[in-house]
A protein has these predicted regions:
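Conserved DHp (HisKA) dimerization/phosphotransfer helix of two-component histidine kinases, i.e.
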Residues: 50-100
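Conserved signal-transmission helix
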Residues: 1-12
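Short conserved segment of the HATPase_c
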Residues: 170-182
Length: 229
């Protein structure tokens, strides 16, 4: 797989989730407009005016952050290898995937955000790989919902980032092919069969690997093994 394929997948994936991002922006924009209208009509009180202004400022800052992070992730770039915080990347991905999670009635369980999970690689590419896995797990629970659990465990110089869903698992006949470029069991045009292959390509480029297995209680566990910092 070449870099061009990764960037094409990046544009396709973020084009797909732009509705969810716009939904997040709309939520904060409603706060801005609502409090702006309230300030126009309400009577006295410097305190109330200040409270309204603070709400507007907070919502505006959140909108700016969403747009900044989205632009940062979608922009093509040459990968770099540098230390970064996994928790920071994950918090940004939550915003991007929240709409899909809500629509699928999926609850996302995250590791302790205060845990010092630091790794070395390209943060944007790592985020792309993880986002592909998160959305894949969300789709595995389509129609019934469930819990998507993200974990992080340090072992022998590598972080094992796990994503466990509560779907039906992967058929043994399909399991050997899930990381093949273009392989998909879905018919929708938005599913190109490139999510897991791109994730594998990115993680391999970091000096790690990715694997998948069915869980005894049902569902699938995907593990991204990446170098710790």
């Amino acid at each position: 797989m070449d870099r061009k394929a990764v960037e094409q997948f990046r544009l396709a994936l973020f084009g797909r989730i732009v509705m969810g991002v716009s939904h997040e922006v709309d939520n904060h924009l409603s706060v801005v407009l609502g409090f702006a209208e309230l300030l126009q009509v309400m009577g006295g009180g410097e305190k109330k005016a200040l409270e309204g202004a603070e709400k507007i400022l907070s919502a505006g800052e959140k909108i700016a952050a969403i747009i900044k992070h989205f632009s940062h992730y979608v922009r093509p770039h040459a990968p770099v290898g540098e230390p970064f915080s996994f928790s920071a990347v994950l918090s940004e991905l939550v915003v991007f995937s929240r709409y899909d999670l809500g629509r699928g009635n999926v609850t996302l369980v995250l590791p302790d955000k205060d845990a010092a999970v630091r790794m070395r690689g390209d943060s944007r590419d790592t985020g792309l790989a993880l986002l592909a896995v998160l959305l894949n797990g969300t789709e595995a629970m389509a129609g019934k919902g469930g819990t998507l659990t993200v974990g992080a465990t340090l072992r022998e110089g590598f972080w094992h980032i796990t994503v466990a869903d509560q779907g039906q698992g992967i058929s043994p006949g399909i399991m050997p092919r899930i990381f093949e470029e273009g392989f998909t069991t879905k018919q929708e045009p938005l599913h190109s069969g490139m999510g897991l292959p791109v994730a594998r390509h990115i993680v391999s480029g970091m000096g790690g690997d990715i694997s998948a297995e069915n869980l005894p209680a049902g569902g699938c566990l995907v593990t991204l093994r990446v170098p710790a910092c």
